[in-house]
Every structure is written in structure tokens, then in C-alpha cells.
UniProtKB/Swiss-Prot annotation:
Its biological purpose: Enzyme of the plastid non-mevalonate pathway for isoprenoid biosynthesis that converts 1-hydroxy-2-methyl-2-(E)-butenyl 4-diphosphate into isopentenyl diphosphate (IPP) and dimethylallyl diphosphate (DMAPP).
Source species of the chain: Botryococcus braunii
Stretch forming the signal peptide: none
Stored PANTHER family: 4-HYDROXY-3-METHYLBUT-2-ENYL DIPHOSPHATE REDUCTASE, CHLOROPLASTIC
Cofactor annotation remark: Binds 1 [4Fe-4S] cluster per subunit.
A single cellular component GO annotation: chloroplast stroma
Short name of one Pfam family: LYTB
One GO MF term attached to the UniProt entry: metal ion binding
Protein name: 4-hydroxy-3-methylbut-2-enyl diphosphate reductase, chloroplastic
């Protein structure tokens, strides 16, 4: 009879920039532990705490009482920043900054393993390991643009203090580089509000790729700082949709996660909003629209995801759809169709334009990466192309990466989401990884013996270097004498083909 090993389960609070090196190899995190018996592997569980409401975050978005939402529309207010002479919203494509990004491992690979895979039909072989890189992966244009603008700001303002209102993107390596360059995230006070007291008029403040709330923009304008706005244009497109909905007195139904920075910023551009996480919550809302229900139950269910004073009986008569750009495209589209169908049933086809607004705000880059993973997993019936497992590389707090991980999980393909090479322990044949829904696991002997085909993808905030280092850890797991992949400088003579701007 086989003896099942004991499994140690830990409940650990996760925080900003959680990484394998910090959660596993660094200072131990406080935890309550208990021993349970489970088959096959050692499991280390990190419990993710619930976030506070989007409205709470907006209410305490600064420590300055005057930072209230401007009376003009958010879109008009953002345009007004351009008239200050202290607002930059586009990169200048400085070559030195791009070169430094690659040197620091936060740009595109032009000579390393990923570049060599691109030149080899997105494949690589090491001994009996075959690696298949997704056709669309890693840095999207908006993320590269944000990091590039931060590097350009450091070059342009070398003697000025530079602040970030939040992580510039959801990747630990990139955020560590920001800190090394003395570009630091504005600290939070005990109550969670950002402490702008150390920001002075001569300073530079960088807004991250997922944007900032109207309240924060108003505060920064009043402080008369130099603003470098790296907000992804796709996120700005969502804000435009929400602003249009507000001007036409429609409630914005936002498909997203209420605690995500992008959704918090998007909500600040709305007059009235309701955030739904998935199709199940959207079905609940649509059932209420058609049949009514218990208002108190509704308000309790969505207490963290509604604007102040929200009344479902009043505010669901006219709605518009918006989305967090990193959500699953198919689910956003399904929610849109459900809302449209519901409003037609409620108000009739002739009145649909008065009661429902929709604008295509789905990010192409997010969809391309999801489609590429579907393509990877879509050949499991073909023995020559079947994947034995999938590696997903990206920050553990990255929403778009979680949805990439979700795809192989739904297909029952062994998949491991790691955020850096430190998650892989070649000596002990162990991998620390995360599930799409936030559980951290330690898996022993995760890499099968014999010939193995591995699919690889990475989140839109993940630089190529992170993928290269993860794959090198995989190869070292197979062969302890592995010494790395030599750069191919012949590839470096040609310009890097970057992901397309949409």
C-alpha cells in the first residue's frame, strides 16, 4: 500500500510585490499552520485578503481634503492638464533609454533566448525538452510604453525627485528596477491613504500604466508637480466610454475587479457605477433589472463595487458597459450581450438606445495573448503537438496573467504560474506556483522524466528576461551542469520587431 506524504498548509497574507524570492526564500511570512494529509505533494497556501471597496479607495485617494472630484467631466479635466505645461503623456522614443531597458532586463530581448526562439519559429530544444512559445506573449505596447516613459523621465530629470503613484506595472522585476533608479512609490499612511506630504513642487510624479483616479490627478495638478502620465491608451479608451455614459446619465456597469487599480481609476470617471466580476454577478444584476428583488440584499452583495448612494431601483434603468482591459474578452462580450438582451426585454427594442450604451473597449493585446494560449492548448489531440505542461510567467498580482493561467486550468492541462526564476528550485526539483484563483502551491517533481513538451506564455507586464531566466531554471532542473544560453549577437544587428501598436 502506498503511504501518502504529509502536507503542510500555510495561510499567508499576500501583499504588493509578492514574489517567490520574498515569500519562499526571503524573510518568512507570519502564518498559522496546520498539518493535513493529502496525496502526492507539499502545498503552501497563501490566503489573499479581500480588498476594500472601490469607493472607499476613491474617498481616501489622497490625504488632502481638497482633492475632490472636479465638477467638469473627468475627460475634460484630463485634457486641461495639457494646458499646465507640466504634463507629459507620450514617449519620445529615446534610444539610450530603450538600450538601458534591455541592459536592465526590462525591455525586449534582441540577442537572448527569447529572441533566438522568435527566430526559430517560437521553439527551442534542450536535451529531451521541447519548448513552444506562444505566438503572442509578454510585453504589450502599452506596458513597454509606460516603462520607456519612466526611463525617459529619469534621463530628462536626473536631479529631481521622481515618485510613482503606484507600481508602474504588475511585475516584480520591473518595479525593483524602478526602486534601484530611485523612482519610488508614494508611501501610504496607516489608514491606507497615500502620503503626498513629501511631494514638492519641483518633483516629478509618474502615473502607472493602469492610470490614476480623477481625484489623484486633481491633487497633483494643485501641487504643481511635473506629471508623466504613462496610462495605457487602451485604458484611456475605457475612460472615454465611461465619461460618455456619465454625460448621458447612464450607470457604468464595469466588468472588472473592484480592488484593481485600473478599475478604481475607471470608476472615478463615472458618475454612477456598478462593478461586476463575472457573468454570474451580471446574471444576478440582470435578474434584478427584470424581476426586482431584495434591495438590501443587492446592496450588501455589491457593497464594495458600487458608487456612493447607489440605488438599484433607480440606477439600473439606463446602463452602459465598460471593462477592465485585462479581463477575459469572451466574458466581457457575454456580459454585454446579456445586458443588451435584458434591456430589450425590459424596455423594448425601440427604446434600447435610450437604455443601453456599449463601446468596444476590449484591449487587443490582452485578447491576442489569450488567443495564443488557446492555440497552444488546442492541439492536445495531436500527439506530435500535445503539451505535457504549460508555464505561465508573470507577476502574481497581474490580472491579465491570471486569465492566461485560467485557460490551461479549464482544459485540465498541468500548468504552473510563476513570477520569476526563483520560483523554480532545480536542486530539489520543486516549483512554487500560483493558481488562477490565488492559491500558492509547492509541487515536487513537477518536471516529468523523459521527453517533454512545454508550452510557455507570459503576461503583458512581463519582460523577456524573466521568461529567459525561468526557462534556464527549467533546463538546470533537467541538467545540473547547464551553464546558460549564449547570446546571439547576429540577431542584435537587426532591429527588434516589437509588438504591434493598436
Amino acid at each position: 500500500m502506498q503511504v501518502l506524504p504529509q502536507t503542510r498548509v500555510q495561510g499567508v497574507p499576500s501583499g504588493r510585490n509578492l514574489s517567490c524570492s520574498k515569500a519562499v526564500g526571503g524573510t518568512p511570512l507570519r502564518a498559522l499552520t496546520r498539518d493535513v494529509v493529502r496525496p502526492a505533494r507539499s502545498v503552501n497556501v497563501h490566503v489573499v485578503a479581500d480588498g476594500e471597496s472601490a469607493d472607499d479607495v476613491l474617498l481616501r485617494s489622497s490625504s488632502v481634503a481638497v482633492a475632490e472630484k472636479p465638477k467638469v467631466s473627468g475627460r475634460a479635466f484630463r485634457r486641461s492638464l495639457k494646458d499646465t505645461g507640466r504634463y507629459v503623456a507620450k514617449p519620445i522614443n529615446d534610444k539610450d533609454s530603450l538600450d538601458l531597458m534591455e541592459e536592465h532586463g526590462v525591455g525586449y530581448s534582441s540577442v537572448g533566448l527569447v529572441a533566438q526562439m522568435r527566430a526559430n519559429n517560437n521553439e527551442w530544444r534542450f536535451k529531451d525538452i521541447r519548448v513552444k512559445l506562444a505566438s503572442a506573449y509578454g510585453y504589450c505596447w502599452g506596458v513597454e510604453r509606460a516603462v520607456q516613459m519612466a526611463y525617459e523621465a529619469k534621463k530628462k530629470y536626473p536631479d529631481r525627485q521622481i515618485h510613482l503613484t503606484n507600481e508602474i506595472i504588475h511585475n516584480p522585476t520591473v518595479n525593483e528596477r524602478m526602486t534601484e533608479m530611485d523612482i519610488n512609490i508614494i508611501e501610504q499612511k496607516e489608514n491606507g491613504s497615500k502620503d503626498f506630504s513629501k511631494v514638492s513642487r519641483q518633483d516629478v510624479v509618474i502615473l502607472p500604466a493602469f492610470g490614476a483616479s480623477v481625484q489623484e490627478l486633481s491633487l497633483l495638478k494643485d501641487l504643481e508637480v511635473q506629471i508623466v502620465d504613462t496610462t495605457c491608451p487602451w485604458v484611456s479608451k475605457v475612460w472615454t466610454a465611461v465619461d460618455n455614459q456619465a454625460r448621458k446619465a447612464h450607470t457604468s456597469v464595469i466588468h472588472g475587479k473592484y480592488s484593481h487599480e485600473e478599475t478604481i481609476a475607471t470608476a472615478s470617471f463615472a458618475e454612477t457605477y456598478l462593478i461586476v466580476r463575472d457573468i454570474e454577478e451580471a446574471n444576478y444584476v440582470c435578474n434584478y433589472i427584470l424581476n426586482g428583488g431584495n434591495k438590501e440584499e443587492f446592496l450588501t452583495k455589491f457593497k464594495n463595487a458600487i458608487s456612493k448612494g447607489f440605488d438599484p431601483d433607480r440606477d439600473l434603468a439606463r446602463v452602459g458597459l465598460a471593462n477592465q482591459t485585462t479581463m477575459l474578452r469572451d466574458e466581457t462580450m457575454a456580459i454585454g450581450k446579456l445586458l443588451e438582451k435584458t434591456m430589450i426585454q425590459k424596455h423594448g427594442p425601440a427604446a434600447i438606445k435610450e437604455h443601453f450604451m456599449v463601446m468596444d473597449t476590449i484591449c487587443d493585446a490582452t485578447q491576442e495573448r489569450q488567443d495564443a494560449v488557446y492555440q497552444l492548448v488546442g492541439q492536445q489531440d495531436n500527439p506530435a503537438e500535445k503539451l505535457d505542461l504549460i508555464l505561465v510567467v508573470g507577476g502574481f498580482n497581474s490580472s491579465n496573467t491570471s486569465h492566461l493561467q485560467e485557460i490551461p486550468e479549464l482544459k485540465n492541462i498541468p500548468s504552473f504560474w510563476v513570477n520569476e526564476a526563483a520560483c523554480i528550485d532545480p536542486v530539489n526539483k520543486k516549483i512554487t506556483h500560483r493558481t488562477a484563483h490565488g492559491t500558492m502551491l509547492d509541487t515536487q517533481n513537477w518536471l516529468p522524466d523523459g521527453p517533454v513538451t512545454i508550452g510557455v506564455t507570459s503576461g503583458a507586464s512581463t519582460p523577456d528576461r524573466a521568461v529567459e531566466e525561468v526557462l534556464e531554471a527549467v533546463f538546470k532542473t533537467r541538467d545540473a551542469s547547464f551553464g546558460g544560453i549564449a547570446p546571439n549577437y547576429d540577431l542584435g544587428t537587426a532591429p527588434v520587431v516589437r509588438h504591434e501598436e493598436h
